[in-house]
């Protein structure tokens, strides 16, 4: 299987009943493994997708893939569609601009099932393509009134009245998002921007 075949937007991401998880490594160690695998199995249950591997087997497969890749900092993806379970990795190429702020544009769009991370990724992919065409880093999904949901590939937080604020519902309950909420040094509020 080629790298192109495994990218979001390929035929493997055309399955309505598939799911994926994206993780990263730092120095060959998986970051937030447990919550990612919890979400993997939770999503599979919600969309009626049978995963034919145990948590332990998947962890072993992940470690094997990671340890056979030359770069210690990787982006790992698990792709599960009916009768296929694929784990692959690539170099973690973080855009250095993210540390100083990036451009984004708003797109009227909402994930069909924001509570799960499925291969039904058409809404986010279309929004991201619009952002790329406009030389923006990401697209911010919003409703008809301009209220923000989330980024096509990112979480959205803002500080308002000294509180860290984010939407409570209608967004992917991501691992990074949850960690930010749990570790925040300022109070967290749920609201609409």
Predicted regions and their residues:
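Dinucleotide-binding Rossmann-like beta1-alpha1 core, especially the glycine-rich loop
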Residues: 77
